């Protein structure tokens, strides 16, 4: 067994040897990111950016846009970030800066901006430039609604964390990500079901072929489902 493990480790090291010890930045300049919404999806994206992508040298989460709430709103959002029933505790530190309305997470200051509509915010005032805005509210899903984000100064592209409607592209990375062009300013990330099954179906189809099939999935009841 030990020989097998050693052999597997050597094989893996040989495959990834070009990446081992390579600390060359992926991007010449960190990519500014803005979250529109801070529900569970927004908080999980925040975790991915701040826990797994370093100290902002690749993706730099600059701001979160939410609706105005109670005076202790920022403290409530900090507590929600600290704990998740599935993913556990946040890996790092979270500090509330009331004066600047900022959450400092793992040393990264993230500004919380209060607004009700996408085109109300001038992001350039917050030193945000050519940002990718990730809309995780699901309120706007078509080109007309999501284009409102592009009217705000400081935003260059929009990603929706849900299926888009109309002519907008829905992208599942590893399946059709090569369909993205430089002209695309708005993209959708498709549905959770699509992301779960399509990569598997693609692999099976390419290797063996698929004549027909039936998909059955179990899901909690969403708000928009009439029972």
Regions found by a protein language model. Give the residues of each.
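Glycine-rich phosphate-binding loop and adjoining beta1-alpha1-beta2 segment
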Residues: 60-105
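A short, basic/flexible loop-to-alpha-helix module at the beginning of a structural domain
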Residues: 12-31, 123-124
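Rossmann-fold dehydrogenase core element
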Residues: 175-191, 211-214
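Conserved anion/nucleotide-ligand pocket segment
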Residues: 196-199, 203-219, 223
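Glycine-rich adenosine-cofactor-binding loop
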Residues: 30-47
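Rossmann-fold NAD(P)-binding glycine/threonine-rich loop
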Residues: 141-184
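A structured beta-alpha segment of the ubiquitous adenosine-cofactor-binding alpha/beta core
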Residues: 88-145
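Conserved small/polar residues in nucleotide/adenosyl-binding loops
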Residues: 1, 5-14, 217-222
């Amino acid at each position: 067994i030990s020989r097998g493990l050693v052999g597997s480790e050597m094989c893996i090291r040989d495959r990834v040897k070009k990446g081992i010890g390579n600390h060359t930045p992926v991007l010449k300049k960190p990519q500014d990111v803005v979250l529109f919404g801070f529900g569970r999806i927004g908080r999980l994206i925040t975790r991915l950016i701040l826990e797994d992508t370093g100290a902002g040298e690749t993706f730099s989460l600059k701001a979160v846009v939410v609706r105005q709430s109670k005076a202790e709103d920022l403290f409530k959002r900090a507590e929600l970030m600290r704990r998740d029933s599935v993913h556990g505790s946040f890996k790092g530190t979270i500090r509330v800066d009331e004066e600047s309305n900022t959450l400092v997470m793992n040393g990264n200051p993230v500004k919380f901006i209060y607004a009700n509509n996408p085109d109300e915010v001038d992001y350039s005032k917050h030193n945000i430039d050519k940002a990718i805005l990730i809309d995780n509210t699901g309120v706007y899903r078509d080109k007309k609604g999501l284009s409102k984000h592009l009217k705000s100064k400081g935003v260059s592209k929009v990603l929706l964390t849900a299926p888009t409607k109309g002519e907008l592209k829905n992208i599942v990375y590893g399946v059709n990500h090569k369909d993205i062009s430089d002209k695309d300013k708005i993209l959708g990330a498709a549905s959770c079901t699509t992301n779960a099954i399509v990569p598997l179906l693609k692999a099976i189809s390419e290797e063996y072929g698929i004549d027909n099939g039936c998909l059955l999935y179990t899901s909690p009841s969403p708000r928009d489902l009439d029972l």
